[in-house]
Amino acid sequence: MSGLHADASRVLREWGAPDEEQEALRRAYAGHLEDHPDGVWRGCASGHITASALVIDPAAGRVLLTLHGKLGLWLQTGGHCEPGDATLAGAALREATEESGIGGLRLLPEPARLDRHRTPCAVHLDVQYAALAPAGARAVISEESADLRWFAYEEVAGVADASVVRLLERSRALL
């Protein structure tokens, strides 16, 4: 078992889910990690933990979304855990920094939500964080995104799916 696996197991064990649906996912994720020593890695065929972060600029009331090149959807930043990731939060912060080009992002201390979804590669057991951007932060598009854009809170429901809207609602409640 890797250090990242141990950290992900601890995070899921200690996380206080905000409702019954999230608690059921928390238990399912924890069980998956108990059953799969490789459950944090892309190679785990039955599904794997991923880490994402919704980049928020609370001073401007906006969030940064990336237009995923392969899926064609406006999403929060995030992706697969990598061997150099020591913690789940570190993986989420790395992904957010790489995909947004914004330095000085700061994660809220615990996950905001969990979201399980099927992708072309496997089932993703996504652990979602909120990342606070410095006021006036400027994003720089990466090769992983077709586009990168700031949206006012009230615009998100018109461009993103329900999972992103729920992540925004939960993240704002944690601010």
Where are these regions (language model features)?
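Histidine-centered active-site/metal-ligand motif
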Residues: H48, H68, H80, E98, ...
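Actinobacteria-biased recognition of intrinsically disordered, low-complexity terminal regions
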Residues: M1-A8, S171-L175
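Short, well-ordered beta-strand micro-motif
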Residues: V55, A130-L132, A152
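Conserved Nudix-box catalytic region and its N-terminal flanking loop in Nudix hydrolases
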Residues: A59-T97, I102, E154
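Acidic, metal-coordinating catalytic segment for phosphate/diphosphate chemistry
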Residues: E14-S52
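NUDIX/MutT-family hydrolases
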Residues: A139-R170
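Active-site segment of metal-dependent pyrophosphate-handling enzymes
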Residues: G101-A137
